[in-house]
């Protein structure tokens, strides 16, 4: 699109955004004036969509984010191995951070999922459906916003159920897609957070929670890769916008009341080799010719995108690729958990022509175990994971071996998890680590023991998280994680959704009142909700969450002093350069 043709659109968008900015200030001022007793402290979450720990460490070392380093990292508490939730996709992880529940328990197990009970297929990646995601949380899953005073703020995030002020910024999101200008959106998101603080301060309080969802890192990682100059530029832009927010908060004398949290939901892994998920399923089915015969006219042809433009017979399997590197498969013949009546019924499809008098075609899918074993032999595959024969068990298939995870819920206390290699080599590689010898014997160990023991490995915490993921009746029958360097969609530089370390380990840093700078070894991002509530002093029932309070404080915080008077106006901030265009 030529620059001159964008001017009318730019003018309309600018006017809409200016009005929205005023609205955020006014909405938060109104909400804060009506809320109950203030907490006197605040948590500001910088939710870095698509940022891995490895990528963040790289930009820190390169000096690309000096303000984040000075204001958060250098004076904060960092976790060396903060493990995201399985799968490494945005919606299940955002839900886990807001509710403290694993994706298998809060109702959104993936970006794209099927529900056999409701005969429902849901794609949260559809831009017209993104803000309906919270509708699918289970009734018992309460978000952070629902547990806090009525002064919380959520900006640009697709999941804001319970937030007092929810700025979806849909116009800005659409404009960013249209112009491919994510720097603009991330600047606006952080500036909106500042406007919300100003509005609350005008009412004599500060928001208990301000949640800024920064989309730029993930979108640019998909298009250019997390190692690219474009990716570093997006993070440098966030850094400058954050510096502007810090200046405003310090000027208003509320900076030292705020706990800053920098967290990622998943990483991104670059890939150069692409395979269609439909083709992989086709290969696995045709390795069982007596069970899925494509020559009898009973094939369901699924068009495959990409340069080859082939069609692949996938029987009645339902396949979803939510973030380019993880694939999920629902099999019609598979038996779902006992509380899920009936198998998933595929949607209506065009009937196949058959000779007069011929019997109706019938596809008989192979057993899940045979199907998964066939998939694991594909040269592109790293791991294939399925539900096990009993609830709470998972079978993991690799190219040269098979293992089993069993959750043990007997006795008192939280569940424990056992792991053993059933055949061949250990797919997760735990058996090759001498320190993990007790953990591969099949004996059950507590979840935290697994987290500490597997933190240095390629698959940290997987023995705990996979059984929890497959608890969901909406989880697939088969979950695919390809080898490094492979993805399921062409035209992308990087993706996520698999279980590799690069996709699962993210930055997690806390900086603010009562936080002693330093490092701790491990955490789960599902720990975020109880940790924030505990720091704010908001009571909660720990039994309602899978996550645990990370106990950031060595001593209780003293009561906060009275707030300063509202700001009497702000000096003009220096203008940012225009965002990059394509």
Please give the residue ranges for each predicted region.
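Active-site nucleophile/metal-coordination loop of metallo-enzymes that catalyze phosphate/sulfate
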Residues: 25-40, 53-147, 158, 163-165, ...
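Beta-strand elements within well-structured catalytic alpha/beta cores of enzymes
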Residues: 38-54, 71-72, 97, 148, ...
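Secreted, luminal/periplasmic, and some membrane-associated catalytic domains
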Residues: 63, 77, 87-89, 111-133, ...
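His/Asp/Glu-rich, glycine-adjacent segments
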Residues: 96, 100-228, 234, 407, ...
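A long, amphipathic alpha-helix that forms part
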Residues: 183-202, 217-259, 268-270, 284-295, ...
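Polar, surface-exposed loop/tail segments
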Residues: 382-398, 454-455, 459, 538-574, ...
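Low-complexity, glycine/alanine/valine/leucine- and proline-rich hydrophobic stretches
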Residues: 483-519
């Amino acid at each position: 699109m030529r620059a001159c043709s964008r001017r009318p659109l730019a003018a309309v968008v600018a006017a809409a955004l200016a009005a929205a900015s005023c609205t955020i200030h006014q909405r938060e001022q109104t909400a804060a004036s009506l809320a109950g007793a203030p907490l006197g402290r605040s948590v500001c979450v910088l939710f870095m969509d698509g940022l891995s720990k490895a990528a963040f460490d790289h930009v820190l070392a390169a000096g690309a984010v000096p303000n984040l380093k000075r204001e958060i990292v250098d004076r904060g508490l960092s976790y060396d191995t903060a493990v995201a939730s399985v799968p490494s996709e945005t919606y299940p992880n955002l839900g886990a951070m807001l509710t403290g529940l694993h994706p298998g328990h809060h109702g959104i197990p993936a970006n794209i999922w099927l529900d056999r009970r409701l005969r429902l297929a849901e794609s949260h990646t559809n831009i017209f459906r993104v803000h309906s995601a919270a509708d699918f949380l289970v009734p018992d899953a309460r978000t952070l916003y629902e547990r806090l005073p009525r002064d919380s703020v959520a900006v640009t995030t697709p999941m804001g159920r319970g937030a007092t002020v929810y700025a979806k910024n849909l116009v800005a999101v659409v404009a960013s897609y249209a112009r491919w200008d994510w720097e603009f959106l991330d600047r606006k998101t952080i500036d909106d957070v500042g406007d919300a603080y100003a509005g609350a301060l005008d009412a004599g309080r500060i928001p208990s929670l301000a949640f800024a969802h920064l989309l730029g890192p993930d979108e640019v990682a998909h298009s250019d890769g997390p190692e690219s100059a474009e990716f570093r530029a997006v993070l440098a832009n966030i850094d400058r916008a954050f510096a502007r927010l810090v200046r405003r908060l310090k000027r208003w004398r509320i900076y030292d009341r705020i706990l800053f949290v920098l967290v990622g939901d998943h990483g991104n892994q670059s890939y150069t080799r692409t395979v269609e998920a439909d083709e992989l399923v086709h290969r696995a089915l045709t390795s069982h010719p007596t069970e899925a015969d494509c020559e009898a006219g009973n094939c369901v042809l699924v068009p495959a995108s990409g340069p080859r433009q082939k069609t692949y017979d996938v029987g009645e399997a339902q396949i979803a690729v939510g973030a380019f590197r993880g694939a999920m498969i629902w099999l019609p013949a598979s038996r779902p958990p006992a509380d899920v009546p009936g198998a998933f019924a595929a949607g209506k499809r065009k009937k196949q022509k058959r000779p007069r008098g011929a019997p109706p075609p019938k596809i008989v899918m192979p057993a899940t175990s045979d199907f998964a074993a066939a998939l694991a032999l594909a040269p592109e595959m790293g791991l294939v994971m399925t539900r096990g024969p009993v609830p709470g068990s998972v079978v993991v298939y690799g190219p040269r071996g098979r293992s089993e995870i069993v959750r043990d819920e007997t006795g008192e206390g939280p569940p424990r998890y056992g792991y053993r290699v059933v055949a061949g080599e250990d797919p997760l590689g735990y058996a090759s680590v001498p320190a993990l010898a007790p953990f591969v014997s099949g004996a059950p160990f507590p979840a935290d023991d697994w987290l500490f023991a597997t933190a240095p490995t390629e698959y940290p915490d997987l023995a705990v998280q996979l059984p929890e993921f497959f608890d969901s009746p909406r989880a697939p029958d088969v979950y695919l994680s390809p080898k490094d360097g492979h993805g399921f969609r062409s035209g992308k530089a990087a993706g996520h959704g698999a279980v590799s370390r690069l996709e699962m380990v993210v930055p997690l840093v806390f900086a603010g009142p009562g936080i002693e700078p330093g490092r701790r070894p491990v955490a789960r991002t599902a720990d975020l909700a109880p940790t924030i509530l505990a720091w704010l002093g908001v009571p909660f029932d720990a039994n309602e969450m899978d996550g645990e309070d990370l106990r950031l404080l060595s001593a209780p915080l003293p009561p906060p002093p009275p707030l300063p008077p509202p700001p009497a106006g702000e000096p003009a901030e220096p203008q940012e350069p225009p965002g990059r265009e394509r």
